[in-house]
UniProtKB/Swiss-Prot annotation:
It comes from Clostridium pasteurianum. The gene is crt. Its EC number is 4.2.1.150. This is Short-chain-enoyl-CoA hydratase. The lineage of its organism: Bacteria, Bacillati, Bacillota, Clostridia, Eubacteriales. Pathway: Lipid metabolism; butanoate metabolism. Belongs to the enoyl-CoA hydratase/isomerase family.
Length: 22
């Protein structure tokens, strides 16, 4: 869990910040 509107909040957030997005 950590996907919030395309924002991955957590440790990988720094690596992935646009999942729901293009």
């Amino acid at each position: 869990m950590g996907f919030n509107g395309g924002i991955l909040e957590g440790e990988e957030x720094k690596a992935v910040v646009t999942i729901n997005x293009p």
